[in-house]
Regions:
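Short acidic loop-to-helix transition motifs that present clustered carboxylates
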Residues: 1-2
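Detector for C-terminal structural segments
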Residues: 5-120
């Protein structure tokens, strides 16, 4: 449709989009704003931002990586290529004897093969 064509070509002032992190690490979300990232729907491109993410990916020092991610996030906040309007939220009522429910479940998928009940 016309909306999707305009969005795909970058011919928009405001468009709806969504982003999920596939893993628990800042780069899961931040990489989508790199200049050449295929998931960069915003058109945002800042070589300084890309450089900070590359430095973070290259370092083994966790504290240094965190600092680099903070700098990259600050650039996004200063330049605001996307406006977070809402966040997905999932709530579930779970029997207290249910075990095997994943704790870090980013996309909400539950593998029922891992579930079981236990009184302990």
């Amino acid at each position: 449709n016309a909306y999707q064509v305009a969005k795909d070509s970058g011919d928009f002032m405001l468009a709806r989009s969504f982003l999920f992190g596939d893993y628990v690490e800042p780069s899961a979300m931040l990489n989508s704003f790199r200049c050449q990232d295929p998931q960069n729907e915003s058109g945002y491109c800042n070589p300084t931002f890309d450089g900070l993410l590359q430095q973070a990916a290259d370092t083994l020092d966790g504290n240094a990586r965190t600092g680099l991610y903070h700098q990259a996030e600050q650039l996004l906040m200063d330049e605001m290529p996307a406006i977070p309007v809402y966040h997905y939220n999932q709530m579930r009522l779970v029997d207290p004897t249910l075990r095997g429910l994943p704790v870090q479940n980013l996309k909400g998928a539950i593998a029922t093969k891992d579930l079981y009940f236990s009184q302990q």
